[in-house]
Design a protein with these regions (language model features):
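Conserved active-site regions of diverse hydrolases
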Residues: 2-45, 53-55, 73, 86-88, ...
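Conserved positions within tandem-repeat grammars
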Residues: 65-66, 77, 91, 97-99
Length: 451
């Protein structure tokens, strides 16, 4: 891990791209054009009002057997944030002992990434299960443009982002086209895409089908979002409360409660935490990796408890990818385009294993259905044998040089001729084609939450 400490300064340079200080003197981007044509009326009269105290229960509260009675409309103060650890975890000092020989860490072996294409998706009648709504939380992997009106540099509402999206116009998605959640929503028969909750052009019909609260630059750690002035996970859960109140005004309290309880909650985050907070803070050199991962896992459990209190019952947790294979990481940590960074992949593997344990515990909760989506393996297969997936380039992105550009540094850059042959769109995010490949595996994983 010594090399990680040496390159921490380089990662800080990348994090600077997402710093709100880079926005001094800049004009806020205009709201993106609508990504589809809708016949529903705009959401007039549905303000974003803060939830009253007590509406968002403590993470320690038991799951309610029935929805709580609606609060009076006159109560509008700011909600208490979900419980956070009071102070960073500190491991106890070990007893003095003779130094042990160096421990050899064995990275994941490539044979576990079988080159065989994924099996066909499991056939489930999702319409019969009442799957009509999707609610999304997380980072840039599932942000459809919530950051567009924030004072942050973590935006993608400019070309070449979105050049292959519906209508061929940028919306704020960090891809050339649709995200995993957009494609998943279409496969579930919900909608062709999932809009951002903070999109000023959001329509009432879209509200019923679901929204994304995700924000590029966010993570499970609140400090991660502060670094880029993104919407923290706490803010996203507050937006869930506002969404629910708006939904009640549209369809009534009982119908709104039923929609939320049957909704698919998709959560995709963690990569930003591990990259732009964990490494840039130089914590890797101090050996505090497991402690930091444990803090993230504790927060995930707390956030999920709050979402369940607000009505969530079906949860899809998308794991982190092999982050050592991201073109950006290959460049900054010096492995180049020939190989992935093994230690970074070990971090991702360790985090995913702990997230799986959270999902297993959630399954033991009454009325809760949860599943983990292993995108690490899917991306690993495509990395070692891209031809089986119709890809030709897996080590660099389509935008610019493909080895460093992300967000603002991708603005206006030339792109590759055939993005559908590339795994990565920029140096950290996938093309729509790769998102389609990943979504096929997602469909294989989520059937259990609908039976």
């Amino acid at each position: 891990m010594g090399r990680l400490a040496v390159t921490a300064a380089a990662l800080l340079v990348v994090a600077w791209q997402f710093s709100p200080r880079t926005m001094v003197g800049a004009q806020l981007s205009a709201p993106p054009p609508p990504d589809e044509q809708y016949d529903d009326p705009p959401m007039d009269g549905l303000p974003l009002s803060p939830p009253p105290p007590g509406e968002i229960d403590s993470p320690a509260s038991p799951l309610p057997d029935s929805p709580p009675p609606p609060e009076p409309e006159t109560r509008e103060p700011t909600p208490p944030a979900p419980t956070q650890p009071q102070q960073p975890w500190q491991a106890p000092l070990p007893p003095k002992r003779e130094p042990a020989p160096p421990r050899t860490v064995v990275p994941p072996q490539e044979p576990v990434w079988s080159s065989a294409p994924p099996p066909p998706a499991r056939v489930v009648n999702y319409t019969a299960t009442g799957c009509t709504t999707m609610l999304v939380f997380g980072d840039s992997t599932v942000d459809p443009g919530n950051n567009n009106r924030l004072q942050t540099a973590a935006k993608a509402n400019f070309l070449p982002y979105g050049m292959n999206f519906l209508g061929g116009r940028p919306t704020g998605r960090f891809s050339d086209g649709r995200l995993i959640t957009d494609i998943l929503a279409e496969k579930l028969g919900i909608a062709r895409s999932i809009p951002g909750f903070r999109d000023p052009r959001l329509r009432s019909g879209q509200l019923r089908r679901g929204v994304s609260f995700a924000s590029a630059g966010a993570g499970y750690d609140e400090a991660t979002a502060r670094r880029s002035n993104a919407l923290s996970f706490t803010s996203q859960i507050e937006d869930l409360w506002r969404y629910k109140r708006n939904l009640q005004r549209l369809v009534g309290p009982r119908s709104a409660e039923r929609l939320v309880r049957k909704a698919t909650f998709v959560i995709s985050a963690g990569t930003t935490d591990l990259l732009f907070h964990y490494l840039a803070s130089n914590q890797s050199a101090s050996g505090s990796g497991p402690q930091y991962e444990n803090q993230l896992i504790t927060r995930i459990a707390n956030y999920t408890q709050v979402m369940a209190t607000l009505g969530g019952r079906r949860f899809v947790f998308i794991g982190v990818p092999p982050i050592g294979c991201l073109p950006l990481v290959r460049t900054l940590l010096g492995t180049g385009t020939t190989r992935c960074h093994e230690n970074m992949n070990l971090l991702a593997t360790s985090f995913n294993e702990k997230l799986v344990q959270v999902v297993r515990r959630l399954k033991n909760e009454p009325d809760i259905r949860a599943t983990f989506v292993d995108i690490y393996t899917t991306i690993g297969k495509a990395t070692i044998d891209p031809n089986n997936f119709g890809l030709t380039e897996t080590s660099r992105g389509c935008c610019g040089t493909g080895i460093i550009e992300i967000g603002q540094t991708c603005r206006g850059r030339k792109t590759c001729t055939h993005p559908s042959k590339y795994m990565y769109w920029d140096a950290a995010h996938h093309t729509e084609r790769m998102n389609q490949i990943i979504t096929d595996d997602v469909m294989n994983s989520i059937g259990e939450i609908y039976v």
